[in-house]
Amino acid sequence: MQTLTASEARANLYRLMDQTAESHQPITISGKRHDAVLLAAEDWQAI
């Protein structure tokens, strides 16, 4: 799973959304206090 900082994710949000939707691979976004996961809506609905 790819991991990016929050700043990197913010700078590339639209590209990351496309990448996640096309590859069906989640992306971890690491922050100072917490981490989050960017996941395609289609994959989220399948959970």
Model-derived segments and spans:
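Structural signal for short hydrophobic segments within the conserved structured cores
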Residues: 2-4
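The conserved cystathionine-beta-synthase
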Residues: 6-22
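Short, charge-rich, low-complexity interaction segments located
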Residues: 26-47
